[in-house]
Amino acid sequence: MSQQTTIRDTGEAAATNAPANSATSTSTPDNQPTPLDAFEVLLITGMSGAGRSHAADCVEDMGWYVVDNLPPKLLIPLVDMMTTSGSGSGSGVHKLAAVIDVRSSYFDELAAVLGHLDDLGVKTHILFLDASNEVLIKRYESVRRPHPLQHGNRLIDGILEERHLLEDLKERADWVIDTSSLSIHQLSTKLYETMLGSGPTTVAVHIFSFGFKYGMPIDADFVADVRFLPNPFWVPNLRELTGHDKPVADYVLSSKGAKEFLDAYEKAIEIALEGYAQEDKHYVTIAVGCTGGQHRSVAMSEELARRLRAHGLNVTVSAREQHKRHSS
């Protein structure tokens, strides 16, 4: 079976999905070159069927730049290209994760490559995913695919050969995770606990206000309709203001039903976020709408964000219709 090296397009997507408290990033400020002694390399390896691909997804969410199926011999030139040691200006990337297995070309050169990286002062880490032979057999049988080292023999023969080839690498791994009894979500939690020293960070929340007259949002997990509140648009001295202005915010938040709605919605969101965290969902979008997206929805979005932040949540707020005026 042929393999293809894949460089994932992380960019802003990885930065957006990364946990708020992970303190990792895919680039240095203003995309400046990264010196070698500030560069880190993570090798994701282990038994086929033990969860390498999912581990790579989690690591990507932590802010690492991930490359799939990278031949070990290409690690040095890739690091060289991404740092100030190369002839270019560097890429700004300072955390590179490479998924490597025994099928990678020149796998036997990996030890020498790691030694070279150590000599260069590059911090290297190895994450090794493992599982029992019995579990690996069940996983392969469930997907009805042959083991990459099976070569027409029994499945257990391929597993045992791979285990033998990876024995030394497992011995020098920084982290070894046995996934035999772990679900996908449990593996995610284990990775965060192991690599970051804590469980998954609180789900990041983005709240945005919008106007129903401009269309329903298609990217929201929750949509709140606050058109039941009195409309400041019909108050002459408030019409030209927005929900960001205190007079409008005071008017909206003191309206009958506003506090009761916020109390109930805040509680519902808290319950949902707890469930999302257990299901390994890292990002939730809440849309709050009124007629034109200028007054009621803006004020309620800001107040909801304030309340959720008080619970220690990472919350951002935006106004979809901020460039549209004269209707709410």
UniProtKB/Swiss-Prot annotation:
Gene3D superfamilies listed in its UniProt record: P-loop containing nucleotide triphosphate hydrolases (3.40.50.300)
Q: Which family does it belong to?
A: Belongs to the RapZ-like family.
Q: Where is the composition biased (Low complexity)?
A: 13-29
The record's listing under Pfam families reads: PapZ_C, RapZ-like_N
NCBIfam families, per database record = PRK05416.1
Q: Which domain of life is it from?
A: Bacteria
Q: Can you tell me which residues bind GTP?
A: 101-104
Give a GO molecular function annotation for the protein: GTP binding
Per UniProt, where does ATP bind?
46-53
Q: Which InterPro entries match?
A: P-loop_NTPase, RapZ-like, RapZ-like_N, RapZ_C
* Stored HAMAP family: RapZ_like
Q: What is this protein called?
A: Nucleotide-binding protein Blon_1085/BLIJ_1109
Role this protein plays: Displays ATPase and GTPase activities.
* Residue numbers spanned by region Disordered: 1-33
Q: Which UniProt keywords apply?
A: ATP-binding, GTP-binding, Nucleotide-binding
